[in-house]
């Protein structure tokens, strides 16, 4: 893969950009403090802004790594305030494969925002980084996340039983993927 670190990406309604130190307040307010958002995630709900600040500081420090891809999701009409997160959370260099994770503030659910963000990252990972495979997974009790993956052309590969863990405990994991040769770019 041709790594180039987290680049600013733009779609019709969104800017996907690097986190900045001051983004912790928006992170806490818009998604990290909401137990409904974190219900099926692998990290706990943030009890205070200090936790969000520490996480944001770690993310900002990692931007010097060319293999680090982590974006703040910004809705253009709202200015520069992050409303969610999308990132490469795992990578297999030999298979040229990346695993994408994402979350979005609850007030922005069911508006096509996460599908737009995921499609933007898929396009970047295939055309710039030249990944061969992009995958993601979700808890079957969170079918809307699978809907995001399907909307972006990802194919359901199967459900691994009791193979994952999230804030609900041990859970099944529904896997989806898309391959570079399944997408046509001009």
Each PLM stretch: what is its role?
Residues 31, 41, 63-64:
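Hydrophobic residues in alpha-helical segments
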Residues 43-44, 65, 96:
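Short, surface-exposed helix-loop/turn micro-motifs enriched in polar/charged residues
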Residues 50, 57-60, 174, 179:
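Juxtamembrane helix-loop transition sites at the ends of transmembrane segments
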Residues 48-50, 63, 168, 183:
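A short hydrophobic/aromatic micro-motif that marks alpha-helical segments and, especially, helix-coil
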Residues 58-72:
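A short helix-loop-beta-strand connector motif used in the catalytic cores of GNAT acetyltransferases and
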Residues 38-58:
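Conserved GNAT-fold acetyl-CoA-binding loop/helix
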Residues 1-26, 30-36, 70-186:
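Acyl-donor (CoA/ACP) binding surface of acyl/acetyltransferases
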Residues 44-48, 69, 141:
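Short, conserved alpha-helical segments within structured domains
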């Amino acid at each position: 893969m041709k790594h180039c670190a987290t680049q600013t990406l733009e779609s019709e309604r969104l800017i996907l950009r690097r986190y900045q130190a001051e983004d912790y307040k928006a992170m806490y307010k818009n998604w990290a403090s909401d137990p409904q958002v974190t219900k099926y995630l692998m990290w706990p709900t943030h009890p205070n802004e200090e936790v969000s600040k520490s996480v944001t500081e770690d993310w900002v420090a990692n931007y010097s790594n060319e293999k680090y891809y982590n974006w703040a999701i910004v809705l253009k009409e709202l200015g520069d305030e992050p409303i969610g997160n999308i990132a490469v959370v795992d990578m297999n260099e030999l298979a040229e494969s990346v695993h994408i994770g994402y979350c979005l503030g609850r007030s922005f659910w069911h508006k096509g925002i996460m599908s737009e963000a995921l499609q933007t990252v898929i396009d970047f990972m295939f055309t710039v980084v030249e990944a061969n495979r992009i995958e993601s997974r979700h808890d079957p009790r969170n079918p809307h996340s699978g809907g995001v993956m399907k909307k972006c052309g990802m194919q359901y590969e199967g459900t691994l039983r009791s193979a994952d863990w999230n804030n609900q405990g041990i859970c099944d994991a529904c896997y989806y993927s898309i391959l570079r040769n399944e997408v046509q770019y001009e």
